[in-house]
Amino acid sequence: MKRLIAGAIAAGLLAAATPAVAQEKLTVFWGKGFYKAEDDALFAAVKKFEEKTKVKVDISQYSPQEMIPKTVAALDSGTPPDVAYGDVFDFQVAGKWAFEGKLEDISDIINPIKGQFEPNALATAFLYSDKTKKKAYYAFPTKQQTMHIQYWIDMLGQAGFKETDIPKTWKEYWTFWCDKVQPAYRKASGSRIFAIGHPMGVDSSDSFYSFLTFMDAYNVKLVDDNGKLLVDDPKVKQGLISAVTDYTDIYTRGCTPPSSTNWKDPDNNVAFHNKTSILTHNATISIVSKWVDDSKNATLTQEQRDQAAKNVKENIATAGFPNKPDGKPMVYRAAVKVGVIFADSKNKARGKEFVKFMMDEENLTPYVEGALGRWFPVTKKAQDSKFWLEDRHKKAVHDQFKAGTVPFEFTKNYKFTILNNENVWAKAINRVVNEKVPVDKAVDEMIARIKQVAG
């Protein structure tokens, strides 16, 4: 008996000394949403994956400005996440990382389901690796965005104008807001608001997306379909001069807050929500989606929820840009948001499993729609969902995308991700408004940098 007891005690001590088998972990870096519903949609998908696989997802969320530095730091330290998604990866790093051989080829995930996606979404994820000397799917597409204009209908009314008074032509449109609406509203309200929240910060993706839209208004093409630069064409230079002139003119006329030269991505939203600006151009409808989220937020008072609902239904308009200076309708560039798996990730097998799970229509669509219209789907089926016809804001987004979009330069020449990361566009804008450099000189500097980087 003593021997049995001693054996049992020894076995117990051995068991106590042996650590429990650790739960398998997947490390994920993911961009933080702009409001609660967006993050809740992500967490719901993560929880579903955890329940299915019994794998713990260790998720770290970062703002657009933090996401790339945090990911680069992890890469440099030799501990990259197993999966990473950032709202500006497509603009600034995915093409460069693929070229440098830092990304895992995930064609085995994308190829079997690529018929579900629209072509532009696939083009953004189909990247060239200088290591393999070929293109492959080195990223996974999740959702997309394009440029919209949003304005306060009630503030426009307080200034004494109706929506039908808004011009449809380019020059007249901006003049209307700056020279008519702004002074009229200031006089009527006694408050020093600004007509336009105009992003110009170098540390902002909004600023270069907005500027490139002004560039598109002048039909400027910086690269051909093979990625060859076209900036030596005198027409391209003149178009850039016109775009920079128009973009900086809004600032020099005192039509946007002085602080907008330093704005980061959320700041034009904040100015709009605070009603210190009447209009802003934004590359998603996150502005109205924030009020949709507030209208359903149980932590707010009923009065606050009712006001949020009224803002969505009555007070905020979602619209497209005016016609281009040549009189033709604006053609919008779409940016497809992508995530990646790194070649040096420690748990690539589970990382691929997570990506495959997220790419499944029944998981991807609720995640995208959970952002309440901030992002538009990249799958054909989800684009035809009744969700996009539920209100006038989402319908406006739906109609813009269905009218056709064009891709960014970086889908043809990956080195434009470097130029976007530097934000040569906002640097030129700030040279003009802060350093009083002539527009043509700022454009010459911009062109020289484009040729140096992407030539």
Where are these regions (language model features)?
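Extracytoplasmic/periplasmic solute-binding protein
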Residues: 129-142, 147, 174-230
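Short, solvent-exposed loop/beta-turn-alpha elements that line the ligand-binding surface or hinge
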Residues: 105-120, 166, 185-186, 194-202, ...
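Hinge/lid segment of periplasmic solute-binding proteins
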Residues: 89-148, 207, 219, 305-321, ...
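C-terminal capping/gating helix-and-loop segments adjacent to ligand/active sites or protein-protein/ligand interfaces
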Residues: 132, 332-333, 374-377, 395-454
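Extracytoplasmic/periplasmic substrate-recognition and gating elements
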Residues: 23-24, 47, 52, 77, ...
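Extracytoplasmic "Venus flytrap"
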Residues: 26-43, 145, 205, 413-417
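Extracytoplasmic "Venus flytrap"/periplasmic binding protein-like
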Residues: 24-27, 44-124, 157-160, 165-168, ...
